[in-house]
């Protein structure tokens, strides 16, 4: 299929200019407006930001460092992007998360382009709306993780792979190899593994494997290596094995270097659940799968229609995929009324191959992370393909076109029922929010929502959504504005959409889904920002910046991740690693991301014992001590009256060792 091949023209679909005007408004309202607040979050968000901060300040773009120690477990491209962003915009939350938002915009563009080419302009429009307004893509671009960038490169590689065969343009395949290399620099070995898991079955089932030379396997692989290999080689040379490491538990002076740690510990052993340290968790299988209804919401409501369409067309799955499909006498007779049967065949094949490729990629991604250790967002790369498939069936059903060129068409009742479910869900959620608002109506607004939350510790807080389960009735006192906004949107929007669907005004009904979701996401971001005292320690960093001297020492009782935002924001003041109360190179994995780096013989002094803390407290330069949750009691038992409280926020306290007047 050439670039000039006409695509299906969708009646009443907005023009390209109008579509991108809508996309721009949604992107600005949902993504850009949320880049400024909240501040960087403790744990992964600010820890990853520290690695990029070190790059920007030192110019070392090979070996990642966090709090002065080697941090070898991640691929570098996201940190390179953040470091460049820091150079341009300064070291802020905006600069940290801008790359994620731009990657999501790139996914929107590719979804619009690809779905529009496969199923028509309306499908492209809906695919873009889905990417910009689904819950999962919004939620997991709020902090510094590489999944949005990885999804963009995956989508680009798959699109270049498929269109390369359609257009017979070598540049498309070179684009595929380049995108794969960048994906590997984003997330590691899963890039080629996931791509091959989708591409190889399609090549075999469709017969395209006979055209394997067009893939440019030799020169393309060379391009892949030219892009991906240099950093891996340099990182390995800069971080070789130290001493005589044995097994997977390092000891001081005896630690595996980059090659083992990155490829074996972080890839193979993480998949098997044997990685050290064991600072991660795994969702129950049923929850892992069912939560995708949330990540793709509200567009997941149309998944039953997608499944129904796939079942109705099951008899043509393979026949339309093979190289000679559409070339029989019966096929030409059935389509004799078409003005250009050849173009129809080409378009049909592209649509069928798109469906297969996106489906295989999505299923493999879901199954892979069902077996391995996982976080909720690990399947992010398959969310955009699933949204594209949903957009294709919704648009085809609205326009009363047969799916994959076969009969029968899917009834629009499937869409009406989905809209009805959305309306029911909207009413129920609005009622729940209303109850929360009513029950907290007499409570005063409390800026520190952390004092109103229950600390239930779901998943021991190793899952990204653990804090959601800490919500209590009184916490609605701090969430009145976002709760009201979400309740109104969910009460009115879905009902209006259902009425429009009943009136056969399908385009307007589907747009109403996106508008409702966008307003809900804006409300969700306002609520998320209200959680800042609980999730970020930036106010304590501000206190240090205003009261501490550069000669002072900041100490964390516990893991660096507990106050990683303080470490990030105060780096410009202290210019030295934060001390951690704990065991260096702990055999039990205490210290999490700091463990491996602290085992290196040239590692700076970062860990101190409790005895050292007691002996040094109150002596020399001023000390500042941070402790969170259970560590607060430990610190108070250890130092007692020697602690001078400076600030308490949520479950975090900042102390110093002498009165501030001194």
Segments the model singles out, each with a brief description of its role:
Residues 2-7, 16, 174, 309-324, ...:
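Membrane-embedded architecture of ER/inner-membrane glycosylation machinery
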Residues 2-407, 440, 572:
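Membrane-integral, polyisoprenol-dependent glycosyltransferases
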């Amino acid at each position: 299929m050439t670039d000039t091949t006409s695509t299906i023209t969708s009646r009443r679909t907005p023009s390209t200019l109008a579509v991108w005007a809508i996309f721009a408004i949604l992107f600005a309202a949902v993504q850009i407006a949320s880049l400024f607040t909240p501040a960087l979050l403790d744990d992964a968000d600010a820890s990853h930001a520290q690695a990029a901060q070190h790059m920007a300040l030192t110019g070392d773009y090979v070996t990642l460092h966090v709090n002065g120690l080697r941090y070898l477990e991640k691929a570098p491209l996201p940190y390179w992007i953040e470091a460049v962003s820091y150079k341009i915009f300064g070291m802020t939350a905006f600069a940290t998360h801008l790359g994620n938002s731009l990657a999501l915009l790139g996914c929107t563009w590719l979804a619009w382009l690809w779905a529009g080419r496969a199923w028509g302009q309306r499908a492209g429009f809906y695919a873009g709306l889905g990417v910009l307004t689904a819950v999962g893509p919004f939620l997991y671009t709020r902090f510094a993780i590489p999944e949005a960038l990885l999804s963009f490169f995956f989508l680009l590689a798959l699109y270049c792979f498929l269109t390369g065969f359609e257009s017979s343009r070598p540049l498309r395949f070179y684009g595929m190899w380049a995108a794969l290399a960048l994906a590997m620099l984003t997330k590691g070995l899963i890039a080629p593994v996931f791509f091959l898991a989708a591409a190889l079955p399609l090549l075999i089932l469709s017969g395209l494997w006979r055209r394997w030379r067009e893939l440019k396997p030799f020169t393309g692989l060379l391009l892949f290596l030219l892009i991906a290999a240099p950093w891996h080689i340099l990182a390995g040379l800069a971080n070789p094995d130290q001493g005589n490491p044995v097994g997977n538990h390092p000891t001081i002076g005896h630690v595996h270097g980059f090659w083992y740690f990155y490829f074996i510990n972080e890839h193979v052993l993480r998949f098997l659940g044997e990685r050290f340290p064991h600072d991660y968790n795994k969702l129950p299988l049923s929850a892992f799968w069912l939560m995708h209804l949330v990540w793709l919401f509200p567009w997941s409501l149309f998944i039953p229609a997608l499944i129904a369409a796939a079942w109705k067309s099951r008899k043509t799955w393979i026949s339309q995929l093979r190289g000679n499909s559409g070339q029989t006498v019966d096929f030409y007779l059935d389509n004799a009324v078409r003005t250009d049967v050849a173009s129809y065949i080409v378009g049909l094949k592209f649509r069928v191959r798109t469906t297969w490729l996106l489906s295989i990629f999505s299923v493999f991604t879901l199954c892979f992370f069902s077996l391995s250790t996982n976080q909720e967002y690990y399947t992010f790369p398959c969310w955009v393909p699933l949204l594209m498939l949903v957009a294709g069936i919704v648009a085809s059903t609205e326009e009363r076109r047969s799916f994959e060129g076969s009969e029968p068409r899917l009834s629009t009742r499937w869409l009406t029922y989905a809209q009805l479910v959305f309306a029911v869900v909207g009413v129920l959620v609005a009622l729940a929010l209303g109850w929360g608002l009513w029950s907290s109506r007499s409570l005063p607004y409390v800026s520190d929502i952390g004092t109103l939350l229950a600390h239930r510790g779901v998943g021991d807080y190793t899952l990204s959504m653990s804090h959601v389960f800490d919500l209590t009735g009184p916490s609605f006192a701090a969430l009145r504005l976002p709760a009201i906004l979400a309740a109104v949107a969910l009460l009115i929007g879905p009902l209006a959409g259902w009425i429009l669907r009943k009136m056969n005004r399908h385009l307007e009904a589907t747009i109403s889904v996106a508008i409702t979701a966008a307003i809900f996401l804006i409300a969700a971001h306002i609520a998320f920002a209200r959680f800042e005292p609980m999730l970020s320690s930036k106010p304590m960093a501000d206190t240090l910046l205003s009261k501490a001297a550069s000669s002072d020492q900041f100490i964390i009782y516990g893991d660096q991740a507990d106050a990683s935002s303080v470490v990030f924001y105060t780096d410009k003041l202290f210019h030295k690693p934060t001390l951690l109360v704990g065991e260096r190179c702990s055999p039990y994995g205490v210290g999490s991301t700091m463990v491996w780096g602290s085992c290196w013989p040239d590692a700076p002094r970062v860990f101190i014992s409790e005895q050292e803390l007691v002996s040094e407290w109150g002596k020399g330069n001023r000390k500042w001590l941070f402790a969170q949750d259970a560590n607060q009691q430990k610190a108070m038992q250890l130092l007692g009256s020697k602690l001078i409280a400076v600030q308490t926020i949520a479950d975090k306290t900042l102390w110093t060792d002498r009165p501030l007047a001194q």
